[in-house]
From Swiss-Prot:
It is found in: Cytoplasm. It catalyses: acetate + ATP = acetyl phosphate + ADP. It comes from Methanosarcina mazei (Methanosarcina frisia). Its cofactor is Mg(2+); Mn(2+). It is an enzyme of class 2 (transferase). This is Acetate kinase. NCBIfam families: ackA. Pfam families: Acetate_kinase. Catalyzes the formation of acetyl phosphate from acetate and ATP. Can also catalyze the reverse reaction. GO terms for molecular function: acetate kinase activity; ATP binding; magnesium ion binding. Belongs to the acetokinase family.
Length: 408
């Protein structure tokens, strides 16, 4: 079975074609600047051969048509025709309270995704555009929605409820949902394998650190607490997001600066985080370099980022009643030795110690803790696309079995 994995954003579309026989990516691609001038599609084959093409991409449907052309290209493609694509897996950011697992897409699932538009206005609408475009181009091909929020449905009510009037939850669904679930699920599963223990016996804290960052406490393979909340704004400080702050700060700034609700939302989501504190960049490589040259605001931004995560690790050790491993993943978590070192400094009192040389290794699964550490520290490159492809394959095969078992 070959599964096409789609992650449709507002002006971009990431994709992978995965051969599920050996779970290998045949091609990885990206459409950029959809609906904007100077659109481009890039695709890299399993053998390293690369396609790069500037072309007009006015909408997601045209972008997906270009994806199919790239995948079937006589020189750069990996399949002869679109018929070789057996199923499509779509990343959908928000499933609300309706989905605790991935789902075969039908009219009811589509409507439920649309019902969550107001919960994820920046993500669900383009996710849905990706689904609709695929349905037009590939009619009859089974499609599966894999939700970022689904993994966190095992968080108990006392952890996901906010101490607000209960009627607001009943009316508007205001509660913690959590995000990056596909990534947290994948690395938690890999952590159990690396530890050589059954999933049900493992307690891990997974740190998905990128421009958006979230931490999750995983017990027995299930999420029991996470930092992101009603939206991805809650939690630790991030690249451009402020993370958790005193809520009273919001009306105070609005009054003092004369900001509208849209403007304060933009300030907290796009102008804050390490970018806001440093007044320099949301790229941690730039901040590292600036801090090493004595830029105090860059150093402060990095200190805040690391401290907030360190504090959550302590909280989650209490929530889990002990921990087997701390896992680092995603762009920063996988690649920044300096950030990992900052976060884990002075935690030897709770059994966390890292090997300086192992910590410098990049791009592979590795245990970077010292032999005498009682808590393992694991770096695990995430693979959300493979998780989406696995769910898609499982659901499609189950559907085929169900249909074949129905008497005629």
């Amino acid at each position: 079975m070959k599964v096409l994995v789609i992650n449709a954003g507002s002006s971009s579309l990431k994709y992978q074609l995965i051969d599920m026989t050996n779970e290998s990516a045949l091609a990885i691609g990206l459409c950029e600047r959809i609906g904007i001038d100077n659109s481009i599609i890039t695709q890299k084959r399993f053998d390293g051969k690369k396609l790069e093409k500037q072309t007009d991409l006015p909408n997601h449907k045209i972008a997906l048509e270009e994806v199919v052309k790239a995948l079937t290209d006589s020189e750069f493609g990996v399949i002869k025709s679109m018929d070789e694509i057996n199923a499509v897996g779509h990343r959908v950011v928000h499933g609300g309270e309706k989905f605790n697992s991935s789902a075969l897409i039908n009219e009811g699932v589509e409507q439920a995704i649309k019902d969550c538009f107001e919960l994820a206005p920046l993500h669900n609408p383009p996710n849905m555009m990706g689904i609709s475009s695929c349905q037009e181009i590939m009619p009859g091909v089974p499609m599966v929605a894999v939700f970022d929020t689904a993994f966190h449905h095992t968080i108990p009510p006392y952890a996901y409820m906010y101490a607000l009037p209960y009627e607001l939850y009943e009316k508007y669904g205001i509660r913690k949902y959590g995000f990056h679930g596909t990534s947290h699920f994948y690395v938690a599963k890999r952590a159990a394998a690396m530890l050589g223990k059954p999933e049900q016996d493992v307690k891990v804290i997974t740190c998905h650190l990128g421009n958006g960052s979230s931490i999750t406490a995983v017990k027995g393979g299930k999420s029991i607490e996470t930092t992101m909340g009603f939206t991805p704004l809650e939690g630790v400080a991030m690249g451009t997001r402020c993370g958790s702050i005193d809520p009273a700060v919001v009306p105070f700034i609005m009054e003092k600066e004369g900001l509208s609700t849209r403007e304060i939302d933009t300030l907290m989501n796009k102008k804050s985080g390490v970018l806001g504190v440093s007044s320099l960049s949301n790229d941690f490589r730039d901040l590292d370099e600036a801090a090493s040259k004595g830029n105090q605001k860059a150093e402060l931004a990095l200190e805040i980022f690391a401290y907030k995560i360190k504090k959550v690790i302590g909280e989650y050790i209490a929530v889990l009643n002990g921990v087997d491993a701390i896992v680092f993943t995603a762009g920063i978590g996988e690649n920044s030795a300096t950030i990992r070192k900052r976060i884990l400094a002075d935690l030897d009192g709770i059994g966390i110690k890292i090997d300086e040389e192992k910590n410098k290794i990049r791009g592979q699964e590795i245990d970077i803790s010292t032999p005498d550490a009682t808590v393992r520290v694991l770096v695990i490159p995430t693979n959300e696309e493979l998780t989406i492809a696995r769910d898609t394959k499982e659901i499609c095969e189950t559907e085929v079995k169900l249909r074949s078992s129905v008497p005629i």
